[in-house]
């Protein structure tokens, strides 16, 4: 009754409500969450952002379907209070926890840094697990307990730097005419220099041709100058903002 496609959750809650009710107690796991843009600390964090209201639609969906377990993911900003006209507004994370608890779920949540699993970026995410019949804390304990084993099985270091991740994609390894875009140069693979690169390339059959979707931009002189100014003047390890007057 539901096509495999993108759907508006509000429309599903309206048009397919009876179908959802028929699923009650039959679903093992619901995984997902609302869009992250409205909660991100890098964004505007507008209290009127309509996307943030999808949290309530999510709770309504869970209330109707009553899955045995659910996994909810969002940015770290989901746990940070919004500032409204009348002071701070409750963290959305606490709202979700309270509502799920009211629905009879046992709930646990953590901030997980995926860089600890050899992902080459410091990406902190709010992860929530809720269960009807089991302790959700067991999931996070298993995640922590198996971190080292996970990396070892994949042949990865506990931490992966950007250089270790993409040094084999540098332009100095060679270029060729892009096979799918005229007037652009594509990059060629360099030698594998890390466990991460070996893992990422394990299913690449022909590693002597152009890297898939790896085209070099044809920058104008103005953009090249801007990039050079940024490289020469921007402080390291700091986010660039308009206040820096570099753009």
Q: What are these language model-derived features?
A:
Residues 76, 105-116:
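Conserved S-adenosyl-L-methionine
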Residues 37-41, 78-81, 118-122, 135-139:
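Short catalytic/ligand-binding loop motif for oxyanion handling, primarily in non-cytosolic enzymes
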Residues 66-68, 105, 124:
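A short helix->loop->beta-strand "cap" motif at the edges of active sites that frequently abuts
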Residues 87-107:
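Conserved Class I S-adenosyl-L-methionine
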Residues 34, 74, 109-111, 154:
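A cross-domain feature marking catalytic cores of carbohydrate-active enzymes
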Residues 1-69, 75-94:
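Core alpha/beta nucleotide-donor-binding catalytic domains of modification enzymes
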Residues 96, 112, 158:
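Internal, well-ordered alpha/beta segment that forms a basic, Gly-enriched binding/recognition surface
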Residues 125, 129-247:
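S-adenosyl-L-methionine-dependent DNA methyltransferase catalytic core
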């Amino acid at each position: 009754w539901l096509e495999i496609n993108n759907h508006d959750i509000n429309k599903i809650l309206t048009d397919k409500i009876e179908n959802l009710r028929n699923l009650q107690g039959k679903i093992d796991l619901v995984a997902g969450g609302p869009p992250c843009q409205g909660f991100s600390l890098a964004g505007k964090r507008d209290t009127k952002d309509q996307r943030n209201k999808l949290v309530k639609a999510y709770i309504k969906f869970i209330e109707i379907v009553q899955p045995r377990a659910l996994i909810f993911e969002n940015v770290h900003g989901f746990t940070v209070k919004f500032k409204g006209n009348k002071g701070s507004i409750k963290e959305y994370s606490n709202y979700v926890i309270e509502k799920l608890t009211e629905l009879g779920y046992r709930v646990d949540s953590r901030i997980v840094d995926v860089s600890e699993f050899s992902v080459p970026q410091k990406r902190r995410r709010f992860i929530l697990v809720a269960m009807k019949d089991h302790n959700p804390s067991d999931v996070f304990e298993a995640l922590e307990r198996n971190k080292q084993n996970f990396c070892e099985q994949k042949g990865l270091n506990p931490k992966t730097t950007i250089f270790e991740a993409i040094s084999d994609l540098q332009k100095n390894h060679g270029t060729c005419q892009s096979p799918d875009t005229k007037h652009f140069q594509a990059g060629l693979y360099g030698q594998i220099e890390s466990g991460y690169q070996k893992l990422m390339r394990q299913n690449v059959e022909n590693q002597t041709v152009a890297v898939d979707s790896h085209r070099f931009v044809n920058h104008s002189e103005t953009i090249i100058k801007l990039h050079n100014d940024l490289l020469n003047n921007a402080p390291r390890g700091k986010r660039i903002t308009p206040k820096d007057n570099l753009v």
